[in-house]
Amino acid sequence: MTNLQTFELPTEVTGCAADISLGRALIQAWQKDGIFQIKTDSEQDRKTQEAMAASKQFCKEPLTFKSSCVSDLTYSGYVASGEEVTAGKPDFPEIFTVCKDLSVGDQRVKAGWPCHGPVPWPNNTYQKSMKTFMEELGLAGERLLKLTALGFELPINTFTDLTRDGWHHMRVLRFPPQTSTLSRGIGAHTDYGLLVIAAQDDVGGLYIRPPVEGEKRNRNWLPGESSAGMFEHDEPWTFVTPTPGVWTVFPGDILQFMTGGQLLSTPHKVKLNTRERFACAYFHEPNFEASAYPLFEPSANERIHYGEHFTNMFMRCYPDRITTQRINKENRLAHLEDLKKYSDTRATGS
């Protein structure tokens, strides 16, 4: 596959025949290729470029300053090259993670919910650029999820009911140039969330694995079935050619779970290039308190409580980060048990 399928989203998804047809086409593209592109307009392109420019400027700052942009309340903030690990091996991008930006006066922050707190922004320009970009990505995310529901002949708000006040977040990445001894950017993995919308510069380095007939894919949300490192050295892998005027879109683990594997979470990896590379990966997510459920097996009792899922994934990824240390020290995971009970009660109506 050399060219990804590219779609233009309607300005509004109403449930009309054209929306249903487009939704089916999106699902078919994911089932065939694992990924597709959506066209962006001039305003979206401007916001993309402003976010990339802010990222480049931040990455030029001294390491001592960048390393100060962390928090023990939230996983938002700076991640140094080599700090993140996939399948036991270090990954090499610099990352700034932007989670939900909540003031210390927010009731959830005051109550000690894990992962809740203000983003440790490096400056106002960076903050404005990233928030503006994420708002634009969020609008696209809502339309994509409505179209996906229609394509499956489900009620239009099946997914967006979960994403109301969603725990949307973004990873802003800089990859260093390759060296004679280093070519790995990020090891093969799937993403833990619902939907991924990504933007990249013109350098290139992203590879995705399309669905392969008969290939068993792990259920990454289960403790014993991590997808990290799977098939990393086994073909086929598709190079995602940098293309102006598009964002790329692929499913995460929660979509695989909710659709019973009709949509597979797309494995992907990054190789370093001869030049530094900048990219943004946006995650359009359920509400922190929401529970995802199997759509086509109504009798199934299995649930993914999003807040627990997110917290577990980040604690696993950053075991030594000050955020993880505080969660453990103050037993903040106890709040998740209470949230899960409330979520289960609402789901069963009891």
From Swiss-Prot:
- Binding of Fe cation: at which residues? H189, H268
> Which is an annotated GO molecular function term of this record?
2-oxoglutarate oxygenase/decarboxylase (ethylene-forming) activity
What Pfam families does this protein map onto?
2OG-FeII_Oxy, DIOX_N
Signal peptide: which range, if any?
none
- Activity as a function of temperature: Optimum temperature is 20-25 degrees Celsius.
User: Per its Swiss-Prot or TrEMBL entry, what cofactor is needed?
Assistant: Fe(2+)
Q: In which pathway does it act?
A: Alkene biosynthesis; ethylene biosynthesis via 2-oxoglutarate
UniProt key word Metal-binding: yes
Tell me the keywords, alphabetical order: Dioxygenase, Ethylene biosynthesis, Iron, Metal-binding, Oxidoreductase, Plasmid
Q: Which reaction does it catalyse?
A: 2-oxoglutarate + O2 + 2 H(+) = ethene + 3 CO2 + H2O; L-arginine + 2-oxoglutarate + O2 = guanidine + L-glutamate 5-semialdehyde + succinate + CO2
User: Among the record's GO biological process terms, what is one?
Assistant: ethylene biosynthetic process
Which ranges carry the Fe2OG dioxygenase domain? Answer: 166-286
Regulation of catalytic or functional activity:
Activated by catalase. Inhibited by chelating reagents such as EDTA and Tiron (4,5-dihydroxy-1,3-benzene disulphonic acid), and by DTNB (5,5'-dithio-bis-2-nitrobenzoate) and hydrogen peroxide.
This chain's function reads: Simultaneously catalyzes two reactions, namely formation of ethylene and of succinate from 2-oxoglutarate, with a molar ratio of 2:1.
Q: Which family does it belong to?
A: Belongs to the iron/ascorbate-dependent oxidoreductase family.
This protein is called 2-oxoglutarate-dependent ethylene/succinate-forming enzyme
Task: Please tell me the species this chain comes from.
Answer: Pseudomonas savastanoi pv. phaseolicola
Gene name, Swiss-Prot/TrEMBL = efe
